[in-house]
Amino acid sequence: GDCLLIRCTFPKDKPVEFLFPVRLAYEPIKTATHLSNHGIYLKKHEVVTVMDYMIKWGTVMSNEIEADIIRNQMGWTDDNRTSFVIGDREYKRDGTVAQTPFSAITDKIGKHMIPKGTFEDWKKAANQLDTPGMELHQYAMLTGFASPLMAYTNTDGAIVCLTGETGAAKTGALFSAVSIWGNPKVLYVHAKKGGTFNALKGRISTLHNMTYAHDEVTNLDAEDVSELSHMISTGKPKLKMQASINAERDFESSASMIALFTSNKSIYDKLSALKHDPNGEVARIIEFMLGQPKILQTDLNFGKRVFEKIGRAHV
């Protein structure tokens, strides 16, 4: 339903922005609860006044301006690829750029895709990969640019896995691809046992066409690696039933991207240990073995350091 984008300033604290569903303006308790969740505390008699205020503003704006569309995914907005969402901006085919409010789904990652730094700074960082022995690191960076182009192909998704021992700058290569779209230190996923697999699926769905970067998939269970490979290559998760009733769960949004993994050990070997014939999964993954380039023998953090504080290439 329709929402109002609320910006509230406080005497001491930082301003906050959030979406207020207009339907809540007809229910005092839900209005008060929603506002209190964002640090706005009202007395009982003030709640009705605020409700009236929200309804009036909603009416005025619906009569005077066209509503912005809240997107639940980054990347292409439709099958015709008429516009592309990055953070809170929607870049349209006609050259215009529209603001798009974050939804509850995109808020956690969208705010880390706000343009910062300069393209010149990013190019300087990227050009440091133009070093003998770092050709595969360059390739990994270019998967970040190639990921949105998967929507133009007959293949929904692909996985590139960088495998090698510690010190091969695998994470630096990962950062280089993610830095195209936003802050790599926040947007990449580091695998640890006990993580929520549903959260990983949600991240893939939200990124939609941007590179999904997963560091150290060695720490994932083989079953999870198998399911991730299926989901990324087909563009959607497996069908599952609802827990309480005999019915399929609601449709989950699809994705079309290139995912970038890193691993200390061969991901092919990991899948082979899971089943006798892992060819279905192996066919979905391209694995490259990385050695340690000479430059990293004296500077182990070269790749990661270069990309962790730079601008965004998409601007």
State what each model feature region is.
Residues 1-132, 202, 207, 272:
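Conserved glycine-centered beta->alpha loop in an early N-terminal alpha/beta scaffold
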Residues 96-187:
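P-loop NTPase catalytic core of nucleic-acid-dependent motor ATPases
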Residues 161, 173-225:
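AAA+/P-loop NTPase substrate/partner-engagement loops
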Residues 213-232, 255, 269-277:
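Conserved AAA+/SF3 P-loop NTPase catalytic/coupling segment centered on the Walker-B
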Residues 226-242, 249:
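Conserved catalytic/switch belt of AAA+ P-loop NTPases
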Residues 241, 256-265, 287-288:
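Structural recognition of the conserved hydrophobic beta-strand(s) that form the central parallel beta-sheet
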Residues 269-295, 306-307:
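A short helix-turn-beta junction within AAA+ P-loop NTPase domains corresponding to the substrate/partner-engaging
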Residues 313-315:
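Conserved small/polar residues in nucleotide/adenosyl-binding loops
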